[in-house]
Amino acid sequence: MIKNKRNLFFCSIFYLFSVDSDAEKNLESLMSVLYSQTSGEIKATFVQTYNTATELLDKAINDEDWDAVLESEGKRNRTPAIILDVDETVLDNTPFNARSIMNQTSYPEGWDIWIYEEKATLIPGVKDFLLSAQKRGVKIFYVTNRRTVYEEATKNNIKKLGLPFDDDVDVLLTRGENGWGSSKASRRSYVSENHRVIMMFGDNLNDFFDLPDKADYVSRKESVLEYENMWGNKWFMLAN
């Protein structure tokens, strides 16, 4: 917390004395980071999301028809599992965003350095939820579009934070691994072959289903409504 406040302080000072022509853009970025790091409301939504999911665990585990993956073939007698995106769903990278503002850089510049530092912190509520799921025999899978080259550092970061991580099974599925592209559909299918995915978590619609290339805001809204029965019981969107 102290480190985050220090980041915010220096970000604010940097902006006040900046003469960059992109000052308006810098201000937007600064306000976004300030909100993410200081807002009680956004933290409450994270905790609320994971608390709601915790309350549904037993129901989801015991219902053989409870399946969160659209690509699933509906096989019976599979081990229950949960799929989570990593960035801004499990790991909080707002210190990286603050650093980018201070350095006048933008993603992906510096992203690899940040990952290798293994210093991302937890999204509020996620640890208690995952530990509760693990105690119930649920397998935890992390499906991320971080590239395969970052897999070891990402695994280390997750394990340092005390989150469930199975070393006997590949539970961290990265972009580029096994020929997987940026679409997560193939990785969802991979997990669902032997596991009944009872819940999925993410901060982007593509964490739950594939959208058409260059989908506009209208089609995105329509897609959300098409699957409205999934949100809040099988699918959980986190604010970003």
Language model feature labels by segment:
Residues 4-11:
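Sec-dependent signal peptide recognition
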Residues 12-20:
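Hydrophobic h-region of N-terminal signal peptides that target proteins for export
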Residues 19-84:
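Non-catalytic pre-domain segments flanking phosphatase-related domains
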Residues 35-44, 112-119, 141-147, 176-177:
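Second-shell loop/turn segments in exported
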Residues 51, 147, 151-240:
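C-terminal cap/substrate-recognition subdomain and adjoining C-terminal extension
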Residues 82-93:
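Asp-based phosphoryl-transfer active-site loop
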Residues 88, 126-158, 203-205:
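Substrate-recognition element of Asp-dependent hydrolases with the DxDx(T/V) motif
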Residues 91, 97-122:
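Metal-dependent phosphoesterase signature
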